[in-house]
Amino acid sequence: MSSYFVNSFSGRYPNGPDYQLLNYGSGSSLSGSYRDPAAMHTGSYGYNYNGMDLSVNRSSASSSHFGAVGESSRAFPAPAQEPRFRQAASSCSLSSPESLPCTNGDSHGAKPSASSPSDQATSASSSANFTEIDEASASSEPEEAASQLSSPSLARAQPEPMATSTAAPEGQTPQIFPWMRKLHISHDMTGPDGKRARTAYTRYQTLELEKEFHFNRYLTRRRRIEIAHALCLSERQIKIWFQNRRMKWKKDNKLKSMSLATAGSAFQP
């Protein structure tokens, strides 16, 4: 992981000391061990593979190094950060702690080689303090988000019982407006023997269907849909009506032909 980041970082910024780095001032303010782009690690800089600024704002109550980081990070605001992208102050990369090439003190800036043990102890305590702050803030953010998400849902859930109570009072049937009714007689009623009642069409619907049948005895699906919309009927009703009308027309023609045949044979000499 670190090798991929080092290669991409060195290719993006060929002159490391001459480039102005975000959250860390100019390149001259860094120590000599970090001026080489090949020696940079993901933990010491708040950058991901795609160049996003993932650094964490530090409080100014700590040492001057972390205070400068907090001020410069406020000067360059980063996008909305998610807790899963935050890195603890004591980690340098996503690998295991045993394989880390640097220590806790080196993750946020190189210390002088001749530092006293007291300085190392203070740096370790400060890094542990920042780690606890990060964990607390990361754990508090999901709780705040959950509370914000739950509060609007509760606010929306409260007016619902009021709306239902006003729409349908107790002991009363809901009011049915004229636009809720069907234009033709309902065919869902059942007769006394349990069979479906005969579909009753209005005079206007029957007249329009008869006119359409006069021009064409067989309908396409598109024309059937158009008639169903025009007459406020279902497509299935139009299909069944035309089937019944064709059977009636065939029966009438058969009877007419038979009567003509019998009449013709009667007049034969």
From Swiss-Prot:
Residues 163-173 have a biased composition (Polar residues). It is found in: Nucleus. GO terms for biological process: anatomical structure morphogenesis; anterior/posterior pattern specification; embryonic skeletal system morphogenesis; endothelial cell differentiation; regulation of transcription by RNA polymerase II. PROSITE patterns: ANTENNAPEDIA, HOMEOBOX_1, HOMEOBOX_2. Residues 77-173 are annotated as: Disordered. Belongs to the Antp homeobox family. This is Homeobox protein Hox-B5. It comes from Homo sapiens (Human).
